[in-house]
Amino acid sequence: MTASLKAIDGAADPGAELAAMMTALGAQARAAARVLAIAPTAQKNEALAAMERAIRAHTPAILQANAEDVAEARAGGATDAFIDRLTLTEARVAVMADGIGVIHDIADPVGQVTERWQRPNGMTIERVRVPLGVIAVIFESRPNVAADAGVLALKSGNAVILRGGSDSFRSCRAIHDCLVEGLREAGLPEAAITRVPVRDRAAVGLLLGGLDGNVDVIVPRGGKSLVARVEAEARVPVFAHLEGINHVYVDRAADLDMAKSIVLNAKMRRPGVCGAAETLLIDRAAASNLAPLVTTLLEAGCEVRGDDAVQRVDPRVKPVAEEDWDTEYEAAIMSVKLVDGVDAALAHIAQHGSHHTEAIVTADQSVASKFLNEVDAAIVLHNASTQFADGGEFGFGAEIGIATGKFHARGPVGAEQLTSFKYRVHGTGQIRP
């Protein structure tokens, strides 16, 4: 235990000590952000390369820390989906390291000139990407978020304060140690990637308050209650990552084999991730597709819930409740419904979707275009699984979250989305008449 944490434990007023510690973290992050904002690309990439090496070299320590977190979660009665999100394996740590390598290789967004034009008076105006400043990332059970958020913030010239959930506390500490090792090796301030070193939930409230103006944006990664609290209490802008109530619509013009493959992957590849599909909508004009699609899910171990028409397909189908259409199961459960074409599918999604990810399976390009244009979601797919809702799959290397709002960033939030812009105006002595 560090001296500062011992002081909090033994303080007459632990709340005041925690507030002082968090305020200091914010001030240190702000100072680091000023350094990162002007850090050369080569120096940031040197840190990223060192971080990748450290993650690979310290994989055994990361896995040991994670095993302790998982054991504690199991003892506490955590669900299988929760355990899946919490668990790291050698392969998952390797993917984490690979993602850092991808972020190393992508273009540095800072300083990019996105537009340039000349005014009639001879002035030249440029719009240039700049960092946001200090980002606070509050997340729950996914320890890989610590790495993703840390390296994306670094690449985009931002400092970041990581507040992982108590369930992944040890895992995040081990990963954070590797990130700090990389910063140190490249000569960048260690406060560029800061981890809240206590489990006290009061730290979240202090982050939401902005730490005396030292936090510029907050990214919540977690369940509905966490996101709701952040949106209700935050005094700084929020990139909201809401639940993934995602749908797959199988149109009358869909190839059945393709539909079976996509639906199975969308639900069962990893049922607990935010890109998993929760509802299957099938065009009533191709009701013959219902039985094979339902059977495919059932035989893969997925619980299927449906109305009377769906239940008649197989006695294993369970009745669907109205609230099921609004539920992110995070488990091997899928609601199934027959709808009267693409318009009815769009209406159902408009009523029950969470603006996260939606997919259509069809060979009819006009129907696909209608769906892609009209559905209100951050990510819309044609003939592909919803599980591609991932920054790594988009070529971003990783993501800090999937923003489901419509301001500033939407969809996978990568390095480019963690920048704002400024206008640079070049004159030759012009004055305004």
From Swiss-Prot:
It is an enzyme of class 1 (oxidoreductase). It is found in: Cytoplasm. Keywords: Amino-acid biosynthesis, Cytoplasm, NADP, Oxidoreductase, Proline biosynthesis. One of its GO terms (molecular function) is glutamate-5-semialdehyde dehydrogenase activity. InterPro entries: Ald_DH/histidinol_DH, Ald_DH_C, Ald_DH_N, Aldehyde_DH_dom, G-glutamylP_reductase_CS, Glu-5-SA_DH, GPR_dom. Pfam families: Aldedh. Pathway: Amino-acid biosynthesis; L-proline biosynthesis; L-glutamate 5-semialdehyde from L-glutamate: step 2/2. PANTHER family: DELTA-1-PYRROLINE-5-CARBOXYLATE SYNTHASE, GLUTAMATE SEMIALDEHYDE DEHYDROGENASE. Catalyzes the NADPH-dependent reduction of L-glutamate 5-phosphate into L-glutamate 5-semialdehyde and phosphate. The product spontaneously undergoes cyclization to form 1-pyrroline-5-carboxylate. Belongs to the gamma-glutamyl phosphate reductase family. This is Gamma-glutamyl phosphate reductase. It comes from Rhodopseudomonas palustris (strain BisB18).
